[in-house]
Amino acid sequence: LVQNRAWGDLGDWLGLEDEKNDKSLLWEAYFIYDLELMNKIATILGKQMDAERFSKLYAERKTFFNKTYIRPNDGKTIFSSFLPKKRGTSIDIQTSYVLPLAFNIINDEQKEKAIKNLLETITRENTTDCGKLCPSYSLMTGFIGTAWIGKALSDNGYSDIAYRLLQQTSYPSWLYSVEQGATTIWERLNSYTHLDGFGGNNRMNSFNHYSFGAVGSWMYNYSLGIQRDEAFPGFKHFILKPAIDLAGKMKYAKGY
């Protein structure tokens, strides 16, 4: 795992707390996720030696991750030796929990604590890297964390929190953009506002950008409840298991 210094390491791009994160946690989590996928691929292709190698490396990196990034007593995410001055201090932001929970990396002994910590980062007020205070149930994740936050919540029994995030209208949230007139997914949640127009940092600003739209995967898999069965590729067998909005605000979901 090598930091791409030419690009300055984009990390959880446009996450409002990205500067509080240990970017190496993101690299390591995705490396472990990739190893799991490679093990499955090698197994399907009948490459047993490769499958065993990936499986062994997966177990080793998972152990490393838990020892390096998860504090044993409270399950909080912590900085690694990649940032020596911060080593062992809390990260404790949404994305730092979302990836290891969505990828099922955290050991069983710490998992419930980590889930509790993720919920705390969502239900509390948070401060952006620029010092702006955001209300509870704000989407503080960037391009990486946003793709997985719904899965991390729903897979651990908290679809109600995922729905609450989805239905939030204050900044930062998906519907904030809609309230400002969005008919597409924007690169930034506040690319345009009624108050400031196109003010602010518009040097890099797409008005048709997928990344925050990754929530669509959660809507398909959990709100609609249509999920694939890995044992039967191509949806030869699939799972229908919609997650109900217990607050009753989303009364139906339609799709295929």
Label every model-predicted segment.
Residues 160-256:
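Non-catalytic C-terminal accessory modules of carbohydrate-active enzymes
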Residues 22-33, 91-95, 140-144, 210-214:
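Aromatic- and histidine-enriched alpha-helix N-cap/loop-to-helix transition segments
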Residues 30-48, 96-109, 148-157, 220-226:
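Well-ordered alpha-helical scaffold segments within catalytic/enzyme domains
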Residues 1, 56-76, 107-132, 158-177:
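Long, well-ordered core segments of solenoidal/helical folds
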Residues 1-27, 45-98, 109, 168, ...:
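Active-site acid/base region of carbohydrate-active enzymes
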Residues 26, 30-33, 37-40, 53, ...:
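Extracytoplasmic/secreted proteins, especially bacterial periplasmic and envelope-associated proteins
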Residues 9-26, 72-88, 99-103, 116-139, ...:
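Active-site-adjacent structural elements in folded domains
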